[in-house]
From Swiss-Prot:
This is RNA-binding motif protein, X-linked 2. One of its GO terms (cellular component) is U2-type precatalytic spliceosome. Residues 192-219, 236-247, 255-273, 315-328 have a biased composition (Basic and acidic residues). Residues 157-172, 291-314 have a biased composition (Basic residues). There is a cross-link at K8, K246 (Glycyl lysine isopeptide (Lys-Gly) (interchain with G-Cter in SUMO2)). Its main location: nucleus. The lineage of its organism: Eukaryota, Metazoa, Chordata, Craniata, Vertebrata. GO terms for molecular function: RNA binding. Part of the activated spliceosome B/catalytic step 1 spliceosome, one of the forms of the spliceosome which has a well-formed active site but still cannot catalyze the branching reaction and is composed of at least 52 proteins, the U2, U5 and U6 snRNAs and the pre-mRNA. Component of the minor spliceosome, which splices U12-type introns.
Amino acid sequence: MNPLTKVKLINELNEREVQLGVAEKVSWHSEYKDSAWIFLGGLPYELTEGDIICVFSQYGEIVNINLVRDKKTGKSKGFCFLCYEDQRSTVLAVDNFNGIKIKGRTIRVDHVANYRAPQESEDVDDVTRELQEKGCGAKTPPSSPPEVSEDEDAKVTKKPKKDKKEKKKKKEKEKTERPVQAELPSCSRSKTVKETDEQSAKKHSSKPSERAQKSECRERKKSHSGSPDGRTSCRGRAEEPEWEAKKEKHKHEHKPSSRREGEEKSRDKDRGRSSGTHSSRHHGHSEGRSHRSRSRSRSRSPDRSHRHKKHRYSHERESFHASDRRHY
């Protein structure tokens, strides 16, 4: 069969599998799963082993190569065999490199089921023998883990023990810190409870004192209902703090009223003296004048304080009694 027809057939198989979505297990590549060798045909004669490795190493690490040459001349015959490190790289190489052109020539890439190494001959060089025996791949380290000495094993085993001890210590510290934190809010709560109890006790103690003051005021009001002294004394005891605060406010307001009261008192004194010298007929007129002066003083100073009213009331009584005595 012509090599170009083989290239076309391989490409058609790959296209059908892609269209149908065939799994890897059922694919035609699975027939060569035990072989990591591929065949390369139609290569240019100028290519060397290094050139071939550069092109085909795109899809995997190349382990071995066998470029077939003429025994007499040593020239390439245009085909070779490649071995990949991973068998799956052969599938990628066949699918992607089959049918490509290198230096104007289409190459063919296909799987190799059973590769046989060439027979040894006397004309073969030492370099080719080493390649055939050892291959051209780089030496990779073994996949198994390196052996560890007994001392290193002991160190590795000691570390987790220390970690466990540290974890236990941390847990113990956390346990000791938690009850301390729980005690702190309890102390603060007890303080707040004590403060509330003290406030409530003060309130209860102030209430009976206020009630006692109110009851005393009521009794004094009943006994001294006619006298203004009783009212003032009761109010003074119950409203001492309020009265002291109002005193300072009304000082400036009562300055002009105090002057007027002084003038009126002097007038009342003069009138009382004159009433003693006159006869009994003029006694009624003096009383009328005194009543008028009272009404005038009340209308002029409506904002007088309780003390001034009390003083005025006592002074008028004295003047009235003095006039009566002189008359008799």
